[in-house]
Amino acid sequence: DGIKILDGLQRSYTIRDVVLDYESGKVPAEDGNPLNNLVRVEIYTGINKLGILYRMLTLNTGQTRMTTRHQIEIIYSDYKTNCQVPGVNLISEVDGNIPRKLGDYHFRDVIEGFTSYIQEDFLTMDRLDILDNVKDLERLAKVTKEDNPFDDFLAAYHHFVCKMKSSFGGELNVEDMKLSSNPYALTAVGIFNKSQSMTGFGNAVSSLKSLGVIGSFKDVDSAIDEISEHTVEDGLYRIVSCLDSLREMAKKIGNDQRLYFYRFFRRLLDKEGAEFGNVDAAAEKAYNDYLRETR
């Protein structure tokens, strides 16, 4: 129990082919039995999952690069079936289910949000590899100081979604909103159970930590507790309206939505800002921020 064997199989298959060639006579006998050569094996004890990931990245130089998403999915694949966050159900792509209920999230989306937290970038899935940017490794080193950053990230985000759901548990009535197309979502859960909001949240939390505004996920939980409930319903309507307007201007709709949610959470969770704890005000200011950054 507790042992992880990391093998990309490239070298293993190469060694197997060399041995088979030797045994079949394809390799001259004078070259010697390849199994007589030494094979280097490294064993690490007392190391956490992110420490393993860090070594996978730094020791993988020169090999075919994995995507950032693949790197982290390898380490956190066990969360698909053994999530430790109460009230959360992680859905894998092969399940074919759509997250609809409170606590249901696509595992892929949570991974993207967590990666945004690590890299302090809501566009993380466009990156080929964490090694492309040394700063990403520095951020990775910072989060390893926490006991279980994946659980902490997911628990904080789920806490936020629960706060939104408890403040407004109904369905938005958008008939009089004159939207240009179908609404982004009609419920609090529907708005915040997608990758766009999770990556925005991850990026915002990481940025606020870098600025020294928050120190840990306990501070994030505290900030969420202070969100004014009477601002939630109007805030959800405003988010849907802003995302509808954004859709007509966006060059890359998904990326622009991520930018909007990043700005939203930066405003909402910043205790030093005027919009702190006010969902409606944060949603409005986030749209203004979006316009300034994209025009």
Predicted regions and their residues:
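Charge-dense, extended regions
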Residues: 234-295
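A short, basic-hydrophobic beta/loop patch
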Residues: 1-54
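Enrichment for repetitive, rod-forming helical segments
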Residues: 17-18, 115, 265
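Conserved aromatic-histidine-acidic binding/catalytic patches
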Residues: 2-7, 185-193, 253
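Solvent-exposed functional surfaces
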Residues: 24, 37-41, 49-246, 259, ...
